[in-house]
């Protein structure tokens, strides 16, 4: 019997204004070195489940989850909002929810771990990538790259966000409501690798930065 493979045409690429969130695990390299690989998998699963729940609780859509981190988009299907408040609240929830997990890992496994989060708001392309049997909807564009770079610069226990996110928050009062009145800092401009010109950065700071 001959089987016919149907190739379904993917939906057209569209553009949207989205707040993109990246989050990843600090301390993963040391964890992978010290523990058997089979022991690392359930720890990563616990970590990613915690992050995903925080993102989805604030309306985020998970677009990529691999290894020690994830990418989520906020307001992807909502033309009436920018997702900045929800993304910032989700980032803070990730830090809060992972804290007891990290404490248990430290107590039981002597592993130091934390979460770093980066946010950027702007235009993205929403489209399907990959061969038919492995297709996935994803976000592409400079906004995604900047969010990823900010995540890589964030310290454990910290959310870094760009000037576009700060502008999208619209007012200090709204920011305070989204962050639970946690102080946020404007950092000196810095260059992001592979991108022209410095950008303005704000953060919900880690204790290590507040102690400086």
Describe every region a protein language model picked out.
Residues 1-6, 99-101:
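Short gly/ser/thr-rich secondary-structure transition/capping motifs
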Residues 7-89:
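Catalytic NTP-binding/metal-coordinating core of nucleotidyl cyclase/transferase enzymes
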Residues 20, 70, 115-121, 201:
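A structural signal for short, well-ordered beta-strand segments
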Residues 66-67, 107-116, 159-163:
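Acidic/histidine metal-binding catalytic segments
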Residues 73-83, 117-136, 156-157:
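Catalytic strand-loop-helix junctions within cyclic-nucleotide turnover domains
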Residues 129-141, 175-183:
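Short, surface-exposed loop/helix-turn segments at secondary-structure junctions
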Residues 153-212:
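Cytosolic regulatory/linker segments at or just downstream of nucleotide-handling modules
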């Amino acid at each position: 019997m001959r089987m016919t493979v149907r190739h379904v045409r993917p939906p057209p690429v569209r553009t949207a204004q989205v707040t993109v969130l990246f989050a990843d695990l600090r301390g993963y390299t040391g964890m992978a070195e010290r523990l058997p690989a089979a022991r690392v998998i359930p720890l990563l699963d616990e970590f990613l489940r915690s992050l995903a729940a925080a993102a989805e609780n604030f309306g985020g859509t998970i677009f990529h989850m691999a290894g020690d981190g994830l990418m989520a988009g906020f307001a992807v299907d909502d033309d009436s909002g920018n997702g900045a408040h929800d993304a910032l609240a989700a980032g803070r929830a990730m830090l809060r929810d992972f804290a007891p997990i990290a404490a248990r890992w430290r107590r039981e496994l002597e592993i130091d771990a934390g979460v770093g989060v980066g946010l950027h708001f702007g235009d993205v392309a929403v489209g399907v990538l990959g061969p038919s049997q492995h297709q996935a909807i994803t976000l592409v564009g400079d906004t995604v790259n900047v969010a990823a770079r900010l995540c890589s610069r964030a310290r454990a226990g910290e959310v870094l966000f760009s000037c576009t996110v700060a502008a999208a928050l619209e007012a200090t009062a709204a920011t305070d409501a989204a962050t639970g009145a946690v102080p946020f800092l404007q950092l000196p401009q810095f260059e992001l690798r592979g991108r022209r010109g410095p950008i303005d950065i704000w953060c919900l700071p880690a204790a290590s930065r507040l102690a400086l």
